[in-house]
């Protein structure tokens, strides 16, 4: 009787999907960033050795911002990183292992890596800036690397965004009719 139950449990566990496997939408930052990095290496004809890839990844991460910089921090490719698991990226990439598999292995080492998601992009050509929150308006300026000194009210942020839009989002600025 116990053997039958044990067999039933073993069968049930073998049929259920592995919870560690990546689902669609998992590790989106990891997969896209490492995919771009791998393509950049191929385009520049870089030698695929672990040491070279490690050096190139550190250089590539210096340009990273936002969620991609956080990914670089988690894998140890930034100067202020606490842990260093960069070899978990460089060795598999040297053997041309797909980035999805690399991210799956990184997820097992540090689950935070796959929890990173890109922020939702705001379509500036169609959005009504008056309906956005001040936090979202600040985020737009921050993404552009700008600050609004002296802005106290929502209208100040909207005015600043409208001033800078031709510089940072020229297509959106030309598409807007409320200017």
Swiss-Prot record:
InterPro entries: ARMET-like, ARMET_C, ARMET_N, SAP_dom_sf. Residues 126-169 are annotated as: Interacts with HSPA5. SUPFAM superfamilies: SAP domain (SSF68906). Residues 93-155 are annotated as: Interacts with ERN1, EIF2AK3 and ATF6. It comes from the Eukaryota. It is found in: Secreted; Endoplasmic reticulum lumen; Sarcoplasmic reticulum lumen. Its main location: secreted. Interacts directly (via SAP domain) with HSPA5/BiP; the interaction inhibits ATP binding to HSPA5/BiP and subsequent nucleotide exchange. Component of a complex containing at least CRELD2, MANF, MATN3 and PDIA4. Interacts (via C-terminus) with ERN1 (via luminal domain); the interaction is decreased in the presence of increasing concentrations of Ca(2+). This is Mesencephalic astrocyte-derived neurotrophic factor.
């Amino acid at each position: 009787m116990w053997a039958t139950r044990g067999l039933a449990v073993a069968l049930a566990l073998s049929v259920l999907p592995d919870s560690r496997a990546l689902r669609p939408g998992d590790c989106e930052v990891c997969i896209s960033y490492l995919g771009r990095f791998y393509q950049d290496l191929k385009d520049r004809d870089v030698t695929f050795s672990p040491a070279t890839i490690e050096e190139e990844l550190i250089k590539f991460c210096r340009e990273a911002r936002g969620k991609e910089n956080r990914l670089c921090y988690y894998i140890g490719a930034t100067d202020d990183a606490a842990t260093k698991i960069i070899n978990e990226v460089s060795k598999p990439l040297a053997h041309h292992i797909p980035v999805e598999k690399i991210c799956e292995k990184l997820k097992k080492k540090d689950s935070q890596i796959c929890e990173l998601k890109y922020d939702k992009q705001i379509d500036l050509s169609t959005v009504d800036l008056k309906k956005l929150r001040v936090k979202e308006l600040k985020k737009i300026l921050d993404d552009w690397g700008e600050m609004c000194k002296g802005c106290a009210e929502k209208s100040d942020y909207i005015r600043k965004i409208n001033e800078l839009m031709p510089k940072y989002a020229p297509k959106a600025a030309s598409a807007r009719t409320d200017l």
